[in-house]
UniProtKB/Swiss-Prot annotation:
Region (G1): 15-22
Domain KH type-2 positions: 205-282
Main location: cytoplasm
Residues that, per the record, bind GTP: 15-22, 62-66, 124-127
Domain Era-type G: 7-174
Subunit annotation: Monomer.
InterPro entries reported for this sequence: G_ERA_dom, GTP-bd, GTPase_Era-like, KH_dom-like_a/b, KH_dom_type_2, P-loop_NTPase, Small_GTP-bd
Reported function: An essential GTPase that binds both GDP and GTP, with rapid nucleotide exchange. Plays a role in 16S rRNA processing and 30S ribosomal subunit biogenesis and possibly also in cell cycle regulation and energy metabolism.
Region (G4): 124-127
Name under which the protein is recorded: GTPase Era
Compartments (UniProt record): Cytoplasm; Cell inner membrane
Stretches the record annotates as G3: 62-65
Key words of the record: Cell inner membrane, Cell membrane, Cytoplasm, GTP-binding, Membrane, Nucleotide-binding, Ribosome biogenesis, RNA-binding, rRNA-binding
Amino acid sequence: MDHIDKKCSMNAIVGTTNAGKSTLINMLVGRKVAAVTPKVQTTRVRMHAVLNNENVQLIFIDTPGIFSPKTKLEKFIVKHAWMSLKGIENVILLLDVKNYLNKHIEKIISRIKQSNINAILVVNKIDMVSQALVDKAIEYMYSLHNFSKTFTISALHDIGLNRLINYLCEISPSGPWLYPEGQISDAPLKFFIAEITREKLFLSLHHELPYSLSVVTEALEEKVDGSLIVKQVIYVTKDNHKTIILGKKGEMIKKISIESRSELEKILDLKIHLFLFVKVRELWQDHLNECVGYVE
């Protein structure tokens, strides 16, 4: 297919923490490319996820939730969220309908207005509330901004996503694809593998741990038999956080390792040898490049 016949668009997904951005990304692409947990602020850097639909390539930018930053890490997170609005065709404001009065919504809409980018409202989690509440949330959102289009969905249960995809394909401009066919994400393998382990940590310990932990994939080594050795360091800020992750007689970290390895083997279709280490680094949030690997 000649590139003249092709269409391509960049679509940033923004919203408050836990609006369901990563779940939506994964459902749209049809494969896990972003960590999904009930803990707020699990997306830390911008990531491109790719959906090819016939002659159209839709690129979705998974962004951190918008919140009030305090530490250097949090400021970094928010800065990169807003950077996602540069050079794109559409901004999708994903709204948790149960939390439509969130105090950060107006701030997000203010930045969207400044960007002068086509804004689409996507109301999520409609399966959890009444239609009356959905209507009330939409009315409130339109009192803040005149969105070009509105969709009501349940990302978790794949309700309403086809209508959103069809609309984005319809309005995408003509142009060459930015990613080769078959590629679903621009996340480096080390980062992607770390995200899987970080997800398992939050799912197992989100009631006990803050989000201020990081997983770094320090080494990947392919063995002769084709299997992959993965060595990861889990950075925490306090000794008691390390104790929680290790668990009694090492049972918790063993559980997390098994769950992470199992999912990685399923996704990568490889035998994985996963080694997890836990290190305490006070205020690691202020040493991003040293122990987290973020690059501005």
